[in-house]
Regions:
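Alpha-helical transmembrane bundle of multi-pass membrane proteins
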Residues: 1-188
Length: 188
């Protein structure tokens, strides 16, 4: 999310928006982030953490795919704004809130401190790399290719979460520990 907010004015300008409008649109996107973050705080205990991450990542996948397509066909700046707002909404109620709750609940007590440290460090490293790579990706892949790559990242998130991350809503530490430590049959 760090790289997204850092480059919003440039994203909107490259979609054909005037500079003054690009900054206003950046503020509008930040308000969307606030509203959907507050919504997620209310929803996270009702819908479940995994459900929110999957729904949010799915919305991000579609939004990135379509932003890339609109850049590819030189579509309207308004469409890009709406799709960026959709991405931000998906991030806010998925990875922006539910991901942090999962990180705090998923590890057994014995490894919780180390596991959380590694997960949070990984999140910050990805944010840093996004900040560093975004301009290079735009230069070498174009805006369309850049957003298609991000859409691929969202798809990988969906697959990873769907197959490997358990739902932690309503589960005790003992249940989560048992999930990770019990013998499971190998699947073929």
């Amino acid at each position: 999310m760090l790289f997204r907010s850092s480059f919003l004015p440039e994203i909107f300008r490259s979609a054909g928006t005037k500079t003054s409008d690009a900054f206003f649109q950046s503020v509008l996107v930040s308000l969307i982030n606030l509203v959907f973050t507050l919504f997620a705080l209310w929803l996270v205990d009702k819908a479940g953490r995994k459900t929110l991450v999957l729904a949010g990542s799915s919305l991000q996948f579609v939004a990135f795919l379509l932003v890339g397509w609109f850049y590819h066909i030189h579509g309207s700046g308004l469409a890009v704004l709406i799709l960026v707002m959709a991405f931000v909404a998906g991030h806010a109620f998925g990875n922006g809130v539910a991901c942090w709750v999962i990180i705090s609940e998923i590890y057994p007590t014995k490894v919780r401190g180390r596991g959380m440290s590694i997960a949070i460090t990984a999140l910050w490293v990805v944010g840093y790399l996004g900040n560093q790579l975004f301009p290079l990706m735009q230069k070498h892949l174009g805006s369309d290719g850049t957003f298609w790559c991000f859409s691929g990242g969202a798809l990988l998130t969906i697959i990873f979460v769907a197959w490997l991350i358990p739902e932690t809503k309503g589960r005790s530490l003992e249940e989560i520990t048992k999930f990770w430590t019990e013998d499971k049959p190998a699947t073929t």
